[in-house]
């Protein structure tokens, strides 16, 4: 365990000298190699006991991997064995697509932040499912979330068609499914968070889920991932709509378009969503507002700007039942997983 944890701080300067997306790919490849050699397989069982329940699912611990780090589901086992209680992969679209032109990911180290405009680059649903089927994570007791989106060239008026295809495709292989309607990098996607649009989409997804549950003889929870840049009225509308359509969870939040916290820094004016430290307070506001409106009707997963165990605890105190990590892993490395698990285990005593 110590070898891996000490290796990342040593490797970080070399990784940060690379283009951010290249470094991301190199890190995943090296992590996969470490897993294949057996170097990470003890980490999963080295975490303290912190069992939790989320959307009716039993978790080893309430610290998860956020979608986006493994878009094609090619590294589920390697990532899960870093000690996560659950892993979410994607976003996957029905058809493969290249995403936006490169460069499309930028570090802002002084702010512990990233800007990305990746644009749902992925290999498509068939390749995604094949990768998921090869994974041993679920057979080892891990919880797997599969995150679905729409293709960039699908008109927003027909977005539901893509989500219905995605839901049907991933349903047999998922412990839960996340509907991503909050990426700022797919044109007009965030419009689906609006009251009428959201209600129409979720109504169709719930109808399809009921049919799939009957077909596969199992209920798979549905979660919706929302943006941090919502007004109080928009949050309230979402909180009213989710339980009406039987939605089990809400993931708060995706990246922000706000630039206040990074103004004047190199790359700050690049188009795309900001993740990392600047999102922490924004997501806390959304989580607190959702919890005050939802009560216990819908589970909340807190994500955005967690770079310490203390910040994971703050997400839970705001009303989340679980948390997810992404950008914090880039700045802190895999040691962050255990730090968050320990903090939440202590907080639950």
From Swiss-Prot:
Endpoints of the signal sequence: none
Catalytic reaction list: (S)-dihydroorotate + a quinone = orotate + a quinol
CDD domains per the UniProt record, alphabetical: DHOD_2_like
Gene3D superfamilies recorded: Aldolase class I
GO molecular function: dihydroorotate dehydrogenase (quinone) activity
Cofactor field: FMN
InterPro entries recorded: Aldolase_TIM (IPR013785), DHO_dehydrogenase (IPR050074), Dihydroorotate_DH_1_2 (IPR012135), Dihydroorotate_DH_2 (IPR005719), Dihydroorotate_DH_cat (IPR005720), Dihydroorotate_DH_CS (IPR001295)
Cofactor note text: Binds 1 FMN per subunit.
Any GO BP: 'de novo' UMP biosynthetic process
Pfam families the record matches: DHO_dh
Record's keyword annotation contains Membrane: yes
Positions that bind substrate: 71, 116-120, 180, 185, 254-255
EC number annotated for this UniProt entry: 1.3.5.2
Binding-site list for FMN: 67-71, 91, 147, 180, 225, 253, 276, 305, 326-327
Keyword terms, alphabetized: Cell membrane, Flavoprotein, FMN, Membrane, Oxidoreductase, Pyrimidine biosynthesis
Membrane topology designation: Peripheral membrane protein
Keyword Coiled coil found: no
Top-level taxon: Bacteria
Principal subcellular localisation of the protein: membrane
Assembly description: Monomer.
NCBIfam families: PRK05286.1-1, PRK05286.1-2, PRK05286.1-4, PRK05286.2-5, pyrD_sub2
Role this protein plays: Catalyzes the conversion of dihydroorotate to orotate with quinone as electron acceptor.
Identification of the protein by name: Dihydroorotate dehydrogenase (quinone)
The organism of origin for this protein: Bordetella bronchiseptica (strain ATCC BAA-588 / NCTC 13252 / RB50)
């Amino acid at each position: 365990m110590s070898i891996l944890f000490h290796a990342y701080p040593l490797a970080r300067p070399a990784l940060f000298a690379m283009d951010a997306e290249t470094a991301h790919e190199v890190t995943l490849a090296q992590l996969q190699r470490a897993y294949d050699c057996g170097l990470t397989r003890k980490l999963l069982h080295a975490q303290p006991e912190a069992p939790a329940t989320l959307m009716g699912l039993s978790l080893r611990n309430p610290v998860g991997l956020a979608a986006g780090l493994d878009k094609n589901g090619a590294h589920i086992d390697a990532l899960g064995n870093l000690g996560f209680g659950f892993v979410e992969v994607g976003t996957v679209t029905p058809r493969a697509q290249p995403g936006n032109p490169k460069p499309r990911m930028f570090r802002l180290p002084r702010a512990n932040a990233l800007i990305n405009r990746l644009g749902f680059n992925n290999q498509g649903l068939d390749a995604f499912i094949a990768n998921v089927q090869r994974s041993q994570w679920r057979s080892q007791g891990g919880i797997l979330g599969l995150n679905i989106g729409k293709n960039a060239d699908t008109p927003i008026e027909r977005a539901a068609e893509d989500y219905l295809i995605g839901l049907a495709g991933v349903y047999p292989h998922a412990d839960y499914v996340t509907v991503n309607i909050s990426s700022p990098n797919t044109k007009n996607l965030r419009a689906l968070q609006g009251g009428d649009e959201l209600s129409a989409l979720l109504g169709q997804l719930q109808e399809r889920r009921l049919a799939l549950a009957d077909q596969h003889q199992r209920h798979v929870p549905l979660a919706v991932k929302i943006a941090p840049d919502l007004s109080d009225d928009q949050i309230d509308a979402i909180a009213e709509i989710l339980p009406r359509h039987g939605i089990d969870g809400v993931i708060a939040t995706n990246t922000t378009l706000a630039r206040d916290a990074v103004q004047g820094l190199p790359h700050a004016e690049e188009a795309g969503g900001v993740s990392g430290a600047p999102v922490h307070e924004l997501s806390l506001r959304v989580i607190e507002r959702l919890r005050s409106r939802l009560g216990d009707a819908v589970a909340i997963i807190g994500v955005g700007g967690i770079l310490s165990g203390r910040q994971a605890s703050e997400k839970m105190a705001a009303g989340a039942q679980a948390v997810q990590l992404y950008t914090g892993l880039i700045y802190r490395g895999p040691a962050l997983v255990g730090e968050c698990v320990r903090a939440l285990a202590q907080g639950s005593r």
